[in-house]
Amino acid sequence: MKHLLQKTLALALALAAVTSSGIASAQEIREHAFKVSQANPKGHPLVTGGEKFAELVAAKSGGKMKLNLFPGGVLGSDAASVSALQGGTIEIVVLNSGILASQVKDFAIYDFPFLFANAKEADAVVDGPFGQKLHAKLQEKGMVGLAYWELGFRQMTNSKRPLNKVEDIAGLKLRVIPNTINIDWVKALDGNPTPLAFTELYSALEQKAVDGQENPLSVILANKFFEVQKYLAITNHQYNPQSVIFSKKVWDTLNAAEKKVLQDAANEAAKYERQVSRDADAGTLDQLKKAGMQVSEFSAAETAKLRERMKPVITKNGEAIPDTVKDMLAELDKLRK
């Protein structure tokens, strides 16, 4: 009888421990509201991805954690948003991964022209050890890399003339992301690069301060560049992953359960956002044509010429990050075997 009583008591204590542990786990998640800064407007796949991210965070936290989205660059330029994130006044920023080269030089690799042959290659690299290693380097700069989303393959637009061959680019004043490699490749094509924050781009195109720009189709449509640009050339010259980054200053105040909610939600939203982006591409081109854009596409021979003209740019910019270039090429080599 005594033995039975002891077993019953032990079982009761074990059940109580499990129950209390479950309650404690649920109570670990506290109420939070986080701001999310994005450059693109509502309706763009990245903002749709942000909406899914917010939905997932709310669901996984039982409604305790909330993401407030600020699309369209209303919280400032990418550079200003990163600075605010480092200071802890903005918690989350979604931005072109290459822009982070101003913080960690290795991120310049993501702006190398003709790096990825297709989106499948890009996914494998950024989701694998290479991409995670680069995101880990952000911590020393006050940022936590949660996931990679997608902006996509970049195309060229301008208001001057159709682009059918490499020589057509010569003399065009093209807005570029403010970093060295983008300035260099436009110069290599005899164009005139104009570094400019994305939030200033539409007005610069409208006022003819620049002749053209280069961005994925989704960006061209969502930001209505067709209103101020007549010619679109399909060049696929660069693929842009997007980094979802979190303020380390705020991250360090979160507990393990809260961090897991954010990390899991960011990863799930990545798969969703990439699919939305890729599903939209064909329809986006049709919409741009209907909006009046004249579309041209580089032939295989012209694309080969474009690659050749950019090789010295890749060599020059690779000298500053030799180990990163070596690791990237090794990853791509494995994927292509």
Explain the meaning of each model-derived region:
Residues 1-11:
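Bacterial N-terminal signal peptides that target proteins for export
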Residues 10-20:
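Bacterial N-terminal signal peptides
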Residues 13, 27-121, 129-132, 136-337:
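N-terminal secretory/targeting leader peptides
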Residues 20-26:
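Sec/Tat signal peptide C-region and signal peptidase I cleavage site
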